[in-house]
Amino acid sequence: NIDLMEEYNYVGLKYLLQQRCIMDFKLLFEKFPQQICPYDYETYFANSDRFVMVTTNCLTGEANYFEEKKNPERVIDIVRASSSLPFVAPIAYVDGIPMLDGGIADSLPIEYAQKQGYKKQVVVLTRNKGYRKKETNPILLKPFYRKYPNLQQAIINRNKIYNKTMEKIERLEDEGKILVIRPINPIKVGRIEKNITKLIELYDEGFRIANEIEFQMNR
């Protein structure tokens, strides 16, 4: 992904003007999977492992969980919706239903995993230990999502749900009931980061931390 970012530079304000999205979604969800680096749907569909994608339903404000192993076009629709960040990406549609990024309604889906029967969980975080999400200014919501009151409420409640879940994750981590992988050094990358050097540094740190955890688990 970093190599593709460096070559194609698919993040920028020009895309916000052209596509109403901070990223070049036409490149990401059309040219990339179809032409530049064709996605191997045959292998993906043949794999029996579960792959769950999360979106936020704009009508209900609730999380929707999808598994798709037959229809390539629907896979792209779901991934596009799951990647559509509020305010910087247009609403996407899955089966005709308006959707946005699943992180709005369920940023940390550990309860969903528990309900699915998974007793051993690995949680991969992109923030340092102790991070808590700030609330979103409700003034920003109506101009963007006037037609979706439940979505507005979900965005308002997001930080409370996120922070409560993070407290649970840290408690379970202290009790040795889940494995958490998170950055150790202070995060220097932004939400929509274009600086290749910063991205590589964060990637290298993640790779190093994962290797250290694997070494400890195999001792």
Report the location of each language-model feature.
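Patatin-like phospholipase
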Residues: 1-219
